Amino acid sequence: MKISRKTTLLAGFLLGLILPLAAQVRTTREEYIDRYKSIAIAQMERYGIPASITLAQGILESDCGNSLLSMRSNNHFGIKCKRDWTGEKVYHDDDAKGECFRAYPTVEASYHDHAEFLDKQPRYDSLFAYASDDYKSWARGLKAAGYATAPDYAQRLIRIIEESQLFLLDRPDGEALYARRYGLPRDPEEWFSSQTSV
């Protein structure tokens, strides 16, 4: 089957129009948080993993759901296959070329598996000694346990949490606090001290 030059030019022209539009439809951090905060809170209530940590990892690992890996596989946490994984797989270049990553039918399944992964892997056991509102210890503990290879992984998580005030979600009334966060102190230390003085 021979493809005409006109067809090729038309296809190229259409791709030239569509691709820039698709690139502009990126999920923002705020949209990502609004979309997944309830799931992160539910995982915190079930497993004790701070919602702020879960969301910050999802934001960082998936680029707010915009990364190729997250779009192809719904994997928002960069969890690799390893030997015990029996689910769907996708191959993606990361630290090495063509690494095996877990694939999920939905983003919600990725969030659930992330909590199960941390809960069941012995190397993360020490994290569960931290309170579910101690996001700094959780961030440092994830890095120390080898969750990511980036040397500044803990600092990046903490920065995301503090910039977006995700620490509010770790509180018992977190969703309500987060909804009215614009009137609250941005600095976590200032916010926590204002709560204890009431």
Labelled PLM ranges:
Residues 2-4, 21-197:
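Catalytic cores of secreted/periplasmic lytic hydrolases that degrade extracellular macromolecules
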Residues 11-20:
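Bacterial N-terminal signal peptides
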